[in-house]
């Protein structure tokens, strides 16, 4: 999973961002579950998912702040 740059994330619609955030949260839950049961082989997926989630949430909060002003 390649990390998107900021321009790619900002070009997404609000609904796409929300869908991706939900998907990444589910993925992180599954990764934690796999790690707890010792089934996880690729631990680097944690970092990738967290970084992508942070990027999406940052853009989402920027949009919320700009509409509130």
UniProtKB/Swiss-Prot annotation:
* One GO location term (cellular component): cytosolic large ribosomal subunit
Q: Which GO terms describe its molecular function?
A: structural constituent of ribosome
InterPro entries for the chain: Ribosomal_protein_uL29, Ribosomal_uL29, Ribosomal_uL29_sf
This protein's source sits in the domain of life called: Bacteria
Tell me the keywords, alphabetical order: Ribonucleoprotein, Ribosomal protein
What Pfam families does the entry give?
Ribosomal_L29
Checking Gene3D superfamilies in the record gives:
1.10.287.310
Any GO BP: translation
Keyword Lipid metabolism appears in the UniProt entry: no
Q: Name the HAMAP family for this protein.
A: Ribosomal_uL29 (MF_00374)
Family affiliation: Belongs to the universal ribosomal protein uL29 family.
Q: What is this protein called?
A: Large ribosomal subunit protein uL29
The protein's gene is named rpmC
